[in-house]
Amino acid sequence: MIKHRGLGVAVVLLSSFAAWIYCIATVVLGLIYQAYPGQENVAILISTLPTIVMMLAAFASSVILRVCNRKLVVVVSMAISIVAGALILLVDMPLVGVIACSALLGIPGGTIASANPTVLAIVAPLNLRDKVLGWHNSLMMLGMATFQLLGGVFGETGRFQDSYKTVLLLIPILVLVILFYPNVDKDRSLAQAAGGAQETAAASAEGGKFPMVAVGMLLLYLFGAIFWNAWFMNYSDYIVNEAQLGTTAMAGVIGSLCSVAGTVSGLVVAFWIKATKRFSMTLAFILCGVAMLLPQLTQSAAGCYAGGILCQFFNLIVVSGLTTYLGLATTGKNATTAMSLLAGIEGSGVFLCGYIVPVVGNLFGGGAGMNIMVSGIILMVIGVAAYFVIKPTHEMVYGKKNTDQQHG
């Protein structure tokens, strides 16, 4: 049973790796513009519409995952993305067809990101439960880095369609998901095998009451996402145009290193929480904010490298940490709702960042560098507020008596 449970956890994490397949378009946007000259304002939807679909799919998952089998939702989502990507690769379609198929690639980013944390919380052994949710985020980040790398390699032909050969990587993953993804909605013994019976019973006893600390964490995530995404939306413009510290090649290297840093932080977030306890998210928010100050303060390439890597590392500590706390503080249908909202809020943060951050930055002179710097300062303020949400959450999850001793 232990071996089977381990295989189930591994396959769930493998499907997490596949969630952000939509990101292929971001690395070949220039080729897309070349393929549709004079239609740039419409062609950009190939890379932006999937994020909107991802956000909508995540919010819809709060309902879908309550009434549908979670394994089926994951399988169907992956199958849709494979078919959509294959159509872009193999069929000579007009622009509207490519936009529609690209949009469908955003579905797994919403549904898988919502379903997998709730499944992991059920099937993972108790001693791994506070780790696997961080691994889930880490695998999604690793998947994004892999898809962008392969998309760029396949796109060397000059045809953006060839980048979608990357989608073929999902076929063996889908086969493994069909065979070994834990069917927690059908086989209730999986929850008991993982020690989850107690949580299930607690969920029933609570009568569906949604914990207030979960509301607080979702709000923290929303406000945080608006401002931590300022780095990703401004760093290339700052490096290439505003500060003129390097070319797009330098920006690309920094982006890749950021992905590596984010992958590492997802793997170590459980140890971070155990070491810093109720201060875990406060410190991560503040250090993420401090890192975002480095490019503007140093006006150097080294400052951009250090700022980007540290920003992404602590950003993913926050993302994985809040995911972990939320997954451990909610059970049953509340957990499904919480994770769906969390995935949707991430997309909302990206969307709102594009409108709110420039307005705030303009109050202090404007520009990409100022947008990043002001956002960093705001993240530090959010970090202070985070303490008042995480302190009771940490006590709820780890126990009041052990808050200052457990895992010390």
Q: Where is each model-derived feature located?
A:
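Extracytoplasmic gate region of multi-pass secondary transporters
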Residues: 26, 214-255
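Structural signature of the two symmetry-related core transmembrane helices
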Residues: 72-86, 279-293
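Cytoplasmic helix-loop-helix junction between adjacent transmembrane helices
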Residues: 103-140
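Helix-loop-helix hairpin linking two adjacent transmembrane segments in secondary transporters
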Residues: 128, 135-182
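A late C-terminal transmembrane helix in Major Facilitator Superfamily
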Residues: 329-365
